[in-house]
Amino acid sequence: MPSLALPINKPSHHNVNYNGNSFNSIHATSFGMSPQSWGNSFSGQAWLRDTIPSLSNVVESQTIPEEDSTSYLNRLEEAFCRDFRCCGQTLEDLHQLIHHYEEQHAVLATDSAVPQEYSLDSNNAAQSNHSHIQALKQRERIRMHDLADQLGTSEISDNSAVLPFAFPANGGAPGPYRVSVVVPAAAAAAAAAASSDMSSDEASSQAETTGTPKKMPESLVMDASSPLSDMSMSIDVGESAANNVFAFNQKDMVDSTYLPPFNYDHDVFSFAPSVASADQFTESSMSPTPEVVSPAATNSAISSPFVRKSSSDLEAKPSKKQRSTPAFSHDSPLTIDYPGSNLVVVDKPYKCPVPNCDKAYKNQNGLKYHKLHGHCSPITTPTPAPIPHQGFVVENKPYRCEVCSKRYKNLNGLKYHRTHSHLQVSMAQAQREVQMNFMRTA
């Protein structure tokens, strides 16, 4: 069968050239309108194979603007994002700029960036503090010499010694103080033997002071320049305790090298029983201001051992509840003054009639239950009357009315009886007396 080629004329407005290819040729080829014959390829394989390259050209032509946009950004970066200047250096691109910023200007959160002015001020302050501490050390040597002279004329016994306790304040910060405590000679010798390996220079470097004591107490000398901001101990003894201040840092106390061999189960300081009351001691322990011992308050600390149980020394006053004595006691018989003052009331008047049985109960029901279940054989005897006690008749109703002699178990019942029974009787008697007086006068 011969092949047929049918020419198709398109309107002139469809013949638009795009990238050198006309839409007329594309559509004509897609529908098989070409000089080639369809032949046996009516299934469409031939004209589809010829059409795919032309469609791929159209897709490639549409991706050209995206490549142009990327190149535009590159050209923009090359034109403006280069030749940076920082710290007198010329940085060619953004990468060098970021690297320079991270190396020179970036500060991490964990770094402690201190201003230069602050560091200079701190150095000057440290130098001035060092010179001040040197002057204080010289003053301390003079003070210890004077203190030794005072100890020669004081009333302290010969079997005691003075041990300096150096507590560094805030790890060597300005404001240290010195504490001297009078201890027995045995404790002083033990402390000296324990610290014999240390040189005198190291020992003197830990002892610093900022004040001069006014007087050497009989048993304890404490003077402090400033209490520490950490944990402190406050002890208030005597009336003049507010004039002295003593505080120690619990954290720095471990570093001290002059601690005598104390028994830590006891308190460090000992006081006489007449020093302070328990109420004053409780109030002072709760107050935030540290207050310390006066010289007159520690007279008995010389003759007695240095360590003493504070719980046995301080005699606590009875509380308000303990001071108020109760109106009656359960251990002794209760005597009622009003009404029925001649009666004696026992808490458990009903006693068991069985010989050698000391059980007693408040009411008959308790005694009845005991008689049925308290012994091997039930007791069928009737419950007796209340047993006389010490020659007096025990009454279960001790409150008696003075008007009608009626008795009640408690005072409330007697009050109710008086209010509702005898008030009307007394009013009737008053009216009767008024009438009798009127008739007599008439």
UniProtKB/Swiss-Prot annotation:
Q: Which organism is it from?
A: Schizosaccharomyces pombe (strain 972 / ATCC 24843)
In the record, which residues are listed under signal peptide?
none
Q: Where in the cell is it found?
A: Cytoplasm; Nucleus
Which InterPro entries does the annotation name? ZnF-Chromatin_assoc (IPR051580), Znf_C2H2_sf (IPR036236), Znf_C2H2_type (IPR013087)
**GO CC term (a single one):** cytosol
Superkingdom of this protein's organism? Eukaryota
Entry keyword annotation includes Protease: no
Q: Which SUPFAM superfamilies does the entry mention? A: beta-beta-alpha zinc fingers
Where mainly found?
cytoplasm
Please identify the protein, giving its name as recorded. Answer: Zinc finger protein sfp1
Q: Does the keyword Transmembrane apply?
A: no
**Zinc finger motifs (C2H2-type), residue ranges:** 350-375, 399-422
